[in-house]
Amino acid sequence: MHDKTWSGRFNEPVSELVKQYTASIGFDRRLAEWDIQGSLAHAQMLKETGVLDEGDLADIRRGMAEILEEIRSGKIEWSSDLEDVHMNIERRLTDKIGDAGKRLHTGRSRNDQVATDIRLWLRDQITVIRSLIQSLQTALLDLAEQNAETVMPGFTHLQVAQPVSFGHHMLAYVEMLGRDNERMADCRCRVNRMPLGAAALAGTTYPIQREITAELLGFEQICQNSLDAVSDRDFAIEFTAAASLVMVHLSRLSEELILWMSPRFGFIDIADRFCTGSSIMPQKKNPDVPELVRGKSGRVIGHLIGLITLMKSQPLAYNKDNQEDKEPLFDTADTLIDTLRIYADMMRGVTVKPDNMRAAVMQGFATATDLADYLVKKGMPFRDAHEVVAQAVRHADEAGVDLSELPLEVLQGFSDLIADDVYGVLTPEGSLNARNHLGGTAPEQVRFQVKRWREMLA
């Protein structure tokens, strides 16, 4: 038997260099279990349409069960001479059961076979990812609930802007991850379309019934155009784009954790098990996990660009270029799953330092907007109030104190609308409580959102 299933057409064997260059078994063998799933469903359909008999189907099932056990136990020997996971499994099956193994590929091409395998694999990865996103959301909700009344500076341009609740800040990431989860679910709808039956590119002359295979494999839809079915990698790009957004969100949170852990901020501490030391500086405690997440986000974004570039100039239908879709896709899923898993654990190891957060609020005139709103509510036009408060801030800055520390007579020098009730809005806590509306940072709203999200995730 030839090593290649297609070698009868050629007058000379493929060179060893070409074998090494074109073989994909080194990475696509991770699709083996899904390849077997697809083959078993295909065999069942061929039997129901009269292409295979009951004996062939029984032999195929028995042989595939043995191969699956060999794969799971690590006993199977993969051969680069057979190029890919599909040919390796088919050869092993034929060695075990003879002619029935040769009949399995009837009405099928590796083109629709690999497209099916990838979709089956990716569908399962998305299920895992969605569960891990929800686990991370739960960890963030725990932090938010514990810190509904913990005041911290909210920033714009990385400058102190207004007081916010630390719980409210954590909820912002819960919202981002909620959108990420929605995108993954939406992406899965398009992943869950079956290309099997498209064969090489034009369909097959055998009396196949694709509906049978789709039902057996749990596909909700069937790809309706054979050319598109074998050449489509939109679903891979879409998944990588969704994964990139998750990583971008985690990279943003990582940047904040890194800053907040710095002694210059001192807002939080991260448990020792997520940090490392220095080989030369004994005092160092480095936030390696969030730093790596920040770095790995670029890796995933790079895979997105790579996949888009891979597809941009391909004519219909299948081209060998598409062999290059798997490694970035595999690495994207692996990186995202590992990141989500470690991140949820890490967030449970975050210790909040409320006193340091409140002290930072007091250093940045964070309640200046509250003073302007106070004046507006007493009848002053907002633009005039803005100017009055700006003058008060300049005075407080020169005096080295916070607005709340200015004597009443000094504040009244800027506007006679100011009375002794002003100090109720100048404290960080007063600022938080004043924003008690849907989506606001008031502790009551934080608790409402935590409850809402817990119900959604239940």
From Swiss-Prot:
It catalyses: 2-(N(omega)-L-arginino)succinate = fumarate + L-arginine. Coiled coil: none annotated. Keywords: Amino-acid biosynthesis, Arginine biosynthesis, Cytoplasm, Lyase. It is found in: Cytoplasm. It is an enzyme of class 4 (lyase). One of its GO terms (molecular function) is argininosuccinate lyase activity. The keyword Mitochondrion does not apply. Its EC number is 4.3.2.1. Pathway: Amino-acid biosynthesis; L-arginine biosynthesis; L-arginine from L-ornithine and carbamoyl phosphate: step 3/3. Gene3D superfamilies: Fumarase/aspartase (C-terminal domain), Fumarase/aspartase (Central domain), Fumarase/aspartase (N-terminal domain). Pfam families: ASL_C2, Lyase_1. It comes from the Bacteria. InterPro entries: Arg_succ_lyase_C (IPR029419), Argininosuccinate_lyase (IPR009049), Fumarase/histidase_N (IPR024083), Fumarate_lyase_CS (IPR020557), Fumarate_lyase_fam (IPR000362), Fumarate_lyase_N (IPR022761), L-Aspartase-like (IPR008948). GO terms for cellular component: cytosol. GO terms for biological process: arginine biosynthetic process via ornithine; L-arginine biosynthetic process. The keyword rRNA-binding does not apply. Belongs to the lyase 1 family. Argininosuccinate lyase subfamily. HAMAP family: Arg_succ_lyase (MF_00006). This is Argininosuccinate lyase. The gene is argH.
